[in-house]
Protein backbone atom coordinates (compact mmCIF):
# COMPACT_ATOMS: atom_id res chain seq x y z
CA UNK A 1 0.00 0.00 0.00
CA UNK A 2 1.24 3.47 -0.83
CA UNK A 3 0.29 6.59 1.07
CA UNK A 4 -0.73 9.63 -0.98
CA UNK A 5 0.61 13.10 -0.30
CA UNK A 6 -2.84 14.16 0.91
CA UNK A 7 -2.87 11.29 3.41
CA UNK A 8 0.65 12.30 4.55
CA UNK A 9 -0.62 15.82 5.20
CA UNK A 10 -3.67 14.52 7.08
CA UNK A 11 -1.51 12.24 9.23
CA UNK A 12 0.82 15.16 9.94
CA UNK A 13 -2.10 17.37 10.95
CA UNK A 14 -3.60 14.57 13.07
CA UNK A 15 -0.29 14.06 14.85
CA UNK A 16 0.04 17.82 15.41
CA UNK A 17 -3.45 17.90 16.94
CA UNK A 18 -2.75 14.87 19.13
CA UNK A 19 0.60 16.15 20.40
CA UNK A 20 -0.66 19.68 21.05
CA UNK A 21 -3.72 18.23 22.78
CA UNK A 22 -1.38 16.61 25.28
CA UNK A 23 -0.60 20.10 26.62
CA UNK A 24 -4.31 20.74 27.19
CA UNK A 25 -4.73 17.47 29.07
CA UNK A 26 -7.33 16.02 26.70
CA UNK A 27 -5.53 12.68 26.25
CA UNK A 28 -5.22 12.87 22.48
CA UNK A 29 -1.65 11.60 22.84
CA UNK A 30 -2.81 8.08 23.73
CA UNK A 31 -2.07 5.18 21.38
CA UNK A 32 -5.74 4.36 20.84
CA UNK A 33 -6.67 7.89 19.78
CA UNK A 34 -3.65 8.37 17.50
CA UNK A 35 -3.93 4.92 15.91
CA UNK A 36 -7.68 5.26 15.31
CA UNK A 37 -7.09 8.55 13.49
CA UNK A 38 -4.31 7.09 11.34
CA UNK A 39 -6.46 4.03 10.62
CA UNK A 40 -9.33 6.26 9.55
CA UNK A 41 -7.07 8.38 7.32
CA UNK A 42 -5.53 5.30 5.67
CA UNK A 43 -8.91 3.59 5.28
CA UNK A 44 -8.31 0.67 7.65
CA UNK A 45 -10.01 1.56 10.91
CA UNK A 46 -10.08 -2.03 12.30
CA UNK A 47 -6.29 -2.33 12.05
CA UNK A 48 -5.91 1.16 13.49
CA UNK A 49 -8.08 0.28 16.47
CA UNK A 50 -6.27 -3.04 16.96
CA UNK A 51 -2.89 -1.30 16.88
CA UNK A 52 -4.16 1.34 19.28
CA UNK A 53 -5.45 -1.29 21.71
CA UNK A 54 -2.21 -3.27 21.61
CA UNK A 55 -0.24 -0.05 22.05
CA UNK A 56 -2.37 0.90 25.05
CA UNK A 57 -1.73 -2.50 26.61
CA UNK A 58 2.00 -2.18 26.01
CA UNK A 59 2.10 1.34 27.45
CA UNK A 60 -0.16 0.58 30.41
CA UNK A 61 2.77 0.63 32.81
CA UNK A 62 4.24 3.77 31.27
CA UNK A 63 1.49 6.08 32.50
CA UNK A 64 3.59 7.62 35.26
CA UNK A 65 7.32 8.19 35.11
CA UNK A 66 9.24 7.35 38.26
CA UNK A 67 11.91 9.73 39.46
CA UNK A 68 13.78 11.33 36.61
CA UNK A 69 13.00 8.60 34.10
CA UNK A 70 10.91 9.34 31.04
CA UNK A 71 9.09 6.46 29.34
CA UNK A 72 9.01 6.01 25.55
CA UNK A 73 6.48 8.16 23.74
CA UNK A 74 3.18 6.56 22.64
CA UNK A 75 3.53 8.22 19.22
CA UNK A 76 5.80 5.34 18.24
CA UNK A 77 3.07 2.70 18.14
CA UNK A 78 0.25 5.22 17.79
CA UNK A 79 1.49 6.80 14.57
CA UNK A 80 4.45 4.91 13.10
CA UNK A 81 3.34 1.49 14.36
CA UNK A 82 -0.08 1.96 12.82
CA UNK A 83 1.45 3.08 9.53
CA UNK A 84 3.63 -0.05 9.57
CA UNK A 85 0.71 -2.32 10.48
CA UNK A 86 -1.53 -0.97 7.71
CA UNK A 87 0.97 -0.51 4.89
CA UNK A 88 2.79 -3.80 5.47
CA UNK A 89 -0.24 -5.96 6.20
CA UNK A 90 0.25 -7.76 2.87
CA UNK A 91 3.90 -8.48 3.76
CA UNK A 92 2.95 -10.54 6.79
CA UNK A 93 3.46 -7.83 9.40
CA UNK A 94 0.74 -8.12 12.02
CA UNK A 95 -0.15 -5.73 14.83
CA UNK A 96 2.22 -7.40 17.31
CA UNK A 97 5.15 -7.19 14.91
CA UNK A 98 4.33 -3.56 14.14
CA UNK A 99 4.34 -2.82 17.87
CA UNK A 100 7.80 -4.34 18.25
CA UNK A 101 9.08 -2.42 15.22
CA UNK A 102 7.68 0.84 16.54
CA UNK A 103 9.45 0.86 19.91
CA UNK A 104 12.73 2.36 18.59
CA UNK A 105 10.62 5.21 17.21
CA UNK A 106 8.90 5.60 20.59
CA UNK A 107 12.28 6.06 22.26
CA UNK A 108 13.52 8.45 19.55
CA UNK A 109 10.32 10.50 19.73
CA UNK A 110 10.74 10.86 23.48
CA UNK A 111 14.17 12.40 22.90
CA UNK A 112 12.58 14.83 20.43
CA UNK A 113 9.78 15.68 22.89
CA UNK A 114 12.28 16.23 25.71
CA UNK A 115 14.31 18.55 23.46
CA UNK A 116 11.11 20.39 22.53
CA UNK A 117 10.22 20.86 26.21
CA UNK A 118 13.75 22.14 26.83
CA UNK A 119 13.42 24.65 24.00
CA UNK A 120 9.92 25.68 25.10
CA UNK A 121 11.11 26.61 28.59
CA UNK A 122 12.89 29.60 27.08
CA UNK A 123 9.55 30.98 25.90
CA UNK A 124 8.44 31.69 29.48
CA UNK A 125 10.95 34.51 29.86
CA UNK A 126 9.48 36.21 26.77
CA UNK A 127 6.03 36.03 28.33
CA UNK A 128 7.29 37.62 31.56
CA UNK A 129 9.10 40.36 29.65
CA UNK A 130 5.97 41.11 27.66
CA UNK A 131 3.93 41.39 30.87
CA UNK A 132 6.49 43.74 32.41
CA UNK A 133 6.13 45.99 29.35
CA UNK A 134 2.32 45.64 29.48
CA UNK A 135 2.45 44.12 26.01
CA UNK A 136 -0.52 41.77 26.31
CA UNK A 137 -0.46 40.77 22.65
CA UNK A 138 3.17 39.70 23.01
CA UNK A 139 2.27 37.83 26.19
CA UNK A 140 -0.50 35.89 24.41
CA UNK A 141 1.87 34.97 21.61
CA UNK A 142 4.64 33.87 23.99
CA UNK A 143 2.24 32.01 26.27
CA UNK A 144 0.72 30.04 23.40
CA UNK A 145 3.95 29.51 21.49
CA UNK A 146 4.60 26.22 23.31
CA UNK A 147 1.42 24.73 21.86
CA UNK A 148 2.41 25.94 18.39
CA UNK A 149 5.92 24.51 18.75
CA UNK A 150 4.52 21.13 19.80
CA UNK A 151 2.05 21.21 16.91
CA UNK A 152 4.88 21.85 14.44
CA UNK A 153 6.97 19.04 15.95
CA UNK A 154 3.95 16.72 15.80
CA UNK A 155 3.32 17.61 12.17
CA UNK A 156 6.93 16.90 11.24
CA UNK A 157 6.84 13.52 13.02
CA UNK A 158 3.51 12.49 11.49
CA UNK A 159 4.25 13.73 8.00
CA UNK A 160 7.76 12.28 8.07
CA UNK A 161 6.53 8.91 9.27
CA UNK A 162 3.87 8.70 6.58
CA UNK A 163 6.05 10.10 3.80
CA UNK A 164 8.91 7.69 4.52
CA UNK A 165 6.73 4.58 4.74
CA UNK A 166 8.12 3.07 1.53
CA UNK A 167 11.71 3.47 2.73
CA UNK A 168 10.70 2.03 6.07
CA UNK A 169 9.21 -0.99 4.31
CA UNK A 170 12.53 -1.59 2.54
CA UNK A 171 14.48 -1.38 5.80
CA UNK A 172 12.09 -3.78 7.53
CA UNK A 173 12.33 -6.26 4.66
CA UNK A 174 16.11 -6.40 5.25
CA UNK A 175 15.62 -7.62 8.83
CA UNK A 176 16.04 -11.42 8.90
CA UNK A 177 12.98 -13.36 10.03
Predicted regions and their residues:
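Transmembrane alpha-helical segments and their short flanking loops
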Residues: 3-7, 11, 71-93, 132, ...
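Helix-loop-helix junctions within the multi-pass membrane cores of secondary transporters/permeases
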Residues: 95-176
